[in-house]
Amino acid sequence: MASNLEALETWAAVLLDRLALVERSKLARSIGQELRRSQQKRMMAQENPDGTKFVPRKQRNLRGKMGRIRRKLAMFRKVRTASYLKVRGDSSSITVGFTGRIALIARVHQFGLKDRAERGAPDVRYEQRELLGFTDADLDLIRDGLLAQLTDH
């Protein structure tokens, strides 16, 4: 995947030099928004960038929860909203990611690190669930967006 991304980068660099800074910024924002939509759809489908499903949550002991058991909810329901998943695009780069406290939580899941579920709780190793990453469709989306901008230009 890294070689595909590097090949796309070298191919796009030559074409981007033809655009003015304002046009590059506009293109970066639009591609960034499309990438965010793609990441949101993938999180909603509970899939890693390689197409595998997220590892499900660990089973909890629900004794004593008489009548208060909530149905299973999808993971990262709020995290995938636009208020947490931010896009930044300028003439030289596109960034799709998280900020603040949500970034720390997302990092733990992205790399499968240890963290505390709540204050005072023991450290727990979380399963790796890649929230952000490039799929082949994302690379095609970038390529198509760049070509569309150049044909309009």
Model-derived regions, located:
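Short, Lys/Arg-rich flexible segments
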Residues: 1-153
